[in-house]
Amino acid sequence: MLQISHLYADYGGKPALEDINLTLESGELLVVLGPSGCGKTTLLNLIAGFVPYQHGSIQLAGKGIQGPGAERGVVFQNEGLLPWRNVQDNVAFGLQLAGVEKMQRLEIAHQMVKKVGLEGAEKRYIWQLSGGQRQRVGIARALAANPQLLLLDEPFGALDAFTRDQIQTLLLKLWQETGKQVLLITHDIEEAVFMATELVLLSPGPGRVLERLPLNFARRFVAGESSRSIKSDPQFIAMREYVLSRVFEQREAFS
């Protein structure tokens, strides 16, 4: 379980997050949404251990987070892949740094590449891939070390609508298969409502938890209902419009 208690953090000498309290259980998909400047990415960087926080605590499985660790896998918006390595070697890179024996890490990489639908592309270089394929590689690399927690920082933002829908579907299927804790940062309201088992709305200046919304649309999808059916459901549309209104309220209040 991820547990964040009374978290305060600064960014560039200014308060970025104030009194953040969140929990994320195994098998849950927590989505964090809010207007620009609300501290979404700062929160993810704190959980990943990339930057320090000033007060409060962040614990994963009862252990405090003080820096990066293999128990947390991160998928970045710009993928963060190595262009001089092929798909297989990018996926295996973290395992190589961890000292995993070559044959073992290549076998794990092969399984992860297959899991994200890129089987047969192992020897292709990153510059030969589409945006959606690169994000699949990023997800495979993050999962290769079998982390307890998967963190994703607006990973679909640069993708076209069709590809974004494909990668959303892939992520939900992987979430169901692995049972991992997943935390997703996004600015896309429909994406947030569709994918979250709990949606956290942040307000800006500094970032605070405005509202927490338990949702079941992601569970309906992994149970077999189509995304088109879910997104045309009046309940989904009503929730999307409610969340949109809340985000606009915050943006207007702090503009």
Curated annotation (Swiss-Prot):
Its EC number is 7.6.2.7. ATP binds at G34, P35, S36, G37, C38, G39, K40, T41. It is an enzyme of class 7 (translocase). It holds the Pfam family ABC_tran. Residues 2-229 form the ABC transporter domain. Disulfide bonds: none annotated. Its main location: membrane. One of its GO terms (molecular function) is ATP hydrolysis activity. InterPro entries: AAA+_ATPase, ABC_transporter-like_ATP-bd, ABC_transporter-like_CS, ABC_transporter_ATP-bind, P-loop_NTPase. SUPFAM superfamilies: P-loop containing nucleoside triphosphate hydrolases. GO terms for cellular component: plasma membrane. CDD domains: ABC_NrtD_SsuB_transporters (cd03293). Keywords: ATP-binding, Cell inner membrane, Cell membrane, Membrane, Nucleotide-binding, Translocase, Transport. PROSITE patterns: ABC_TRANSPORTER_1, ABC_TRANSPORTER_2, TAUB. It is found in: Cell inner membrane. It is a peripheral membrane protein. It catalyses: taurine(out) + ATP + H2O = taurine(in) + ADP + phosphate + H(+). The complex is composed of two ATP-binding proteins (TauB), two transmembrane proteins (TauC) and a solute-binding protein (TauA). Part of the ABC transporter complex TauABC involved in taurine import. Responsible for energy coupling to the transport system. Belongs to the ABC transporter superfamily. Taurine importer (TC 3.A.1.17.1) family. This is Taurine import ATP-binding protein TauB. The lineage of its organism: Bacteria, Pseudomonadati, Pseudomonadota, Gammaproteobacteria, Enterobacterales. The gene is tauB.
